[in-house]
């Protein structure tokens, strides 16, 4: 598995589809959001695209897990329009209900907002939802005869843009806090332990037991394990 510098580190699994093409030098300046019209995982999307000429760069399941399927440096086959696909990074979101609302879970929404902010930051995109293609956050239905991304997501685009911009506008906390130690319970099936407080640091281990751990220091959303093994992201824990 090869992860490129241009790809999101938020993706914890990767299934590389063969359904992609060159961007032909086109700069990325748009993000297109889709819904899956089903409650699928990233791997299930990958399997569907084995027999369909379609793809997206990322898929988010109903638990909020992000899977990458196409490198951002390539054009995914997302809206059957070379011009728009060449300019876009595309995201598929799982549904927890069917027609007519096609809702997505809170976990999916949270991951979607983080991913949109991450894509925008790395590609120097200013997140703007204008209700049309002049903005940078776009809907699938604007390019094809489809209801995608469904009524629920359709009404959330302004919210997604605002919340993603809050992440980008948040000042980086450069001060390491040293509070009294506290305990957390891991809520993720697999939580990476990193050498330092951030995804740019090397993975040195993984917690898979959903156990209780003591945190001795915090920095932003990261906590240092009492064992000294490293740091974990506190977004995937519950404070006790």
Q: Locations of the language-model features?
A:
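N-terminal catalytic cores of peptidoglycan-degrading enzymes
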Residues: 1-85
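Basic/polar, cationic surfaces and motifs that engage anionic cell-wall
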Residues: 2-25, 97-178
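Cell-envelope and extracellular/periplasmic
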Residues: 37, 89-99, 142
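SH3-family beta-barrel domains
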Residues: 172-192, 206-209, 218-219, 238-240
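Short alpha-helix capping/helix-loop boundary micro-motifs
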Residues: 197-202
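SH3/SH3-like beta-barrel fold
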Residues: 210, 223-227
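Boundary regions of SH3-family modules and the immediately adjacent low-complexity/disordered segments
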Residues: 226-240
């Amino acid at each position: 598995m090869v992860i490129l510098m241009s790809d999101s580190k938020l993706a914890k699994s990767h299934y590389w589809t063969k359904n992609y093409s060159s961007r032909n030098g086109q700069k990325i300046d748009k993000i297109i959001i889709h819904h899956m019209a089903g409650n699928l995982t990233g791997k299930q999307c990958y399997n569907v695209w084995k027999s369909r000429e379609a793809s997206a760069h990322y898929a988010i399941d109903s638990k909020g897990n992000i899977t990458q399927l196409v490198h951002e440096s390539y054009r995914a086959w997302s809206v059957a329009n070379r011009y728009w696909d060449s300019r876009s990074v595309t995201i598929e979101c799982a549904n927890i209900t069917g027609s007519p609302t096609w809702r997505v879970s809170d976990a999916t929404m949270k991951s979607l907002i983080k991913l949109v902010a991450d894509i925008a930051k790395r590609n120097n995109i200013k997140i703007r939802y204008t209700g049309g293609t002049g903005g940078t956050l776009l809907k699938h239905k604007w390019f094809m005869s489809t209801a995608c991304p469904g009524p629920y997501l359709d009404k959330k685009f302004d919210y997604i843009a605002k919340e993603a911009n809050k992440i980008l506008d948040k000042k980086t906390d450069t001060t390491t806090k040293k509070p009294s130690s506290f305990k957390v319970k891991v809520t993720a099936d697999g939580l990476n332990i990193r050498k330092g407080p951030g995804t740019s640091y090397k993975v040195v281990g993984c917690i898979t037991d959903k156990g209780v751990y003591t945190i001795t220091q915090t920095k932003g959303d990261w906590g240092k394990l009492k064992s000294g093994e490293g740091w974990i992201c506190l977004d995937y824990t519950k404070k006790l």
